[in-house]
């Protein structure tokens, strides 16, 4: 993907569960944070905790945009959460068998596409989303595996996307230099254990990304 050299690489920190980490994301200049509502994920956030973060962000200037992540959730569950929790975007997974794409058309969307083979823009033409997340594939898991994939498989994609899959503070600069994505997305790569964000890793990841812009 060829990006505008003057454009700053966007940063999304996914799987935020507590206010402390949310504050760090804002202070360090993250562009997006993700609330995970996948029932099987160690990163699933309680609605009450999500509300606290939303209220804090609403009281502050220049807060990150809030993304609500769903995978194998019923539409009723998605609707019940999105109707009571202020947010900016909804993130869904392209091969999620439960997703009703038509019912999401009125929302700002991010689609997570899990890469298995070489893909081109033509392969992605039917995906209606503000931008994509190109992530590693793992059967039955919607993301957050901590596994990278062969970036050559997306070398022909010019559509706007966030690169995900196995990124961490030690490799994100190299990933940006090679892939030149619109932005990067991280979950497990800034954790001390599954679902537990490490403040220093979050800080270092964001600063490393910002250093490339």
Curated annotation (Swiss-Prot):
It is an enzyme of class 5 (isomerase). Its EC number is 5.3.1.24. Keywords: Amino-acid biosynthesis, Aromatic amino acid biosynthesis, Isomerase, Tryptophan biosynthesis. GO terms for molecular function: phosphoribosylanthranilate isomerase activity. It comes from the Bacteria. This is N-(5'-phosphoribosyl)anthranilate isomerase. The gene is trpF. Pathway: Amino-acid biosynthesis; L-tryptophan biosynthesis; L-tryptophan from chorismate: step 3/5. Pfam families: PRAI (PF00697).
């Amino acid at each position: 993907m060829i990006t505008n050299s003057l454009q700053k690489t966007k940063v999304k920190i996914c799987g935020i569960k507590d206010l402390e980490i949310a504050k760090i994301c804002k202070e360090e200049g993250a562009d997006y944070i993700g609330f995970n509502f996948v029932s099987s994920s160690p990163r699933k956030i309680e609605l009450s905790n999500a509300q606290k973060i939303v209220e804090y962000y609403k009281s502050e200037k220049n807060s990150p945009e809030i993304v609500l992540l769903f995978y194998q959730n019923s539409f009723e569950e998605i609707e019940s959460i999105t109707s009571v929790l202020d947010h900016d975007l909804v993130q869904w997974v392209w091969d999620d068998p439960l997703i009703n794409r038509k019912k999401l058309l009125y929302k700002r969307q991010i689609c997570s596409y899990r890469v298995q083979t070489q893909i081109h823009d033509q392969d992605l033409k039917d995906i209606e989303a503000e931008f994509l997340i190109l992530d590693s594939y793992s059967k039955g898991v919607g993301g957050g595996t901590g596994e990278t994939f062969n970036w050559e498989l997306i070398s022909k994609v010019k559509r706007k996307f966030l690169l995900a899959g196995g990124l961490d503070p030690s490799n994100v600069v190299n990933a940006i230099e090679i892939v030149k994505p619109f932005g990067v997305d991280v979950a497990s790569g800034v954790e001390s254990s599954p679902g537990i964000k490490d403040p220093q890793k979050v800080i270092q990841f964001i600063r490393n990304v910002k250093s490339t812009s």
